[in-house]
């Protein structure tokens, strides 16, 4: 099979038969994972860019402030930020998987994340219902960690929950701190 056929088959498997697909993915080479992730990342970034561009125009009465250069910037930012955040999340997730008994290696954690994130990356860009695909990807992530690290569903779920909740709590506390300090900044004196 070609790379395209492999990727389409993997996507179909993740959507229709995820447990079997994860089990068959244990020996996937790193090149396959990288190619697969690159494809879903580029599709996700392109579709997010289109949605952001269209929504920006609707908020501005049809006048989009982004222009052609802005569209390119949004796309590049989406690709780079998704790439960096995904890599950091895989490392962070692997720490918790390891603590909870997963000993099959970082590559298996990367596979669980990449393949599990398929619904979010391919369909999460859809306004208003994207959250459904985020939840679906979370559940697939649990299955992926369970199957690829051969640990219990409970341990896999706890690893994912911890890996998600701690950064969210940190973000919340930082946001609250910044908001509370913005209220203490004196306003500039108004002089007509």
Regions found by a protein language model. Give the residues of each.
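Perimembrane helix-loop junctions in membrane proteins
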Residues: 24-27, 52-60, 98-105, 144-151, ...
């Amino acid at each position: 099979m070609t790379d395209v056929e492999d990727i389409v088959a993997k996507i179909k498997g993740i959507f229709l038969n995820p447990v079997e697909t994860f089990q068959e993915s244990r020996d996937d080479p790193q090149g396959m994972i990288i190619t697969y992730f690159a494809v879903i990342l580029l599709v996700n970034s392109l579709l997010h860019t289109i949605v952001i561009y269209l929504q920006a125009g609707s908020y501005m009465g049809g006048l989009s402030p982004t222009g052609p250069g802005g569209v390119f910037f949004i796309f590049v930012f989406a690709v780079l930020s998704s790439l960096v955040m995904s890599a950091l999340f895989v490392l962070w997730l692997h720490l918790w998987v390891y603590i909870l008994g997963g000993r099959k290696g970082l590559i298996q954690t990367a596979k669980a994340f990449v393949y599990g994130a398929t619904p979010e990356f391919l369909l999460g860009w859809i306004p208003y219902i994207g959250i459904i695909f985020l939840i679906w990807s979370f559940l697939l992530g649990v299955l992926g960690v369970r199957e690829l690290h051969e640990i219990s569903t409970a341990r896999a779920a706890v690893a994912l929950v911890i890996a998600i909740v701690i950064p969210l709590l940190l973000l919340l506390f930082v946001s609250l701190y910044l908001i509370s300090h913005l209220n203490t900044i004196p306003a500039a004196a108004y002089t007509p």
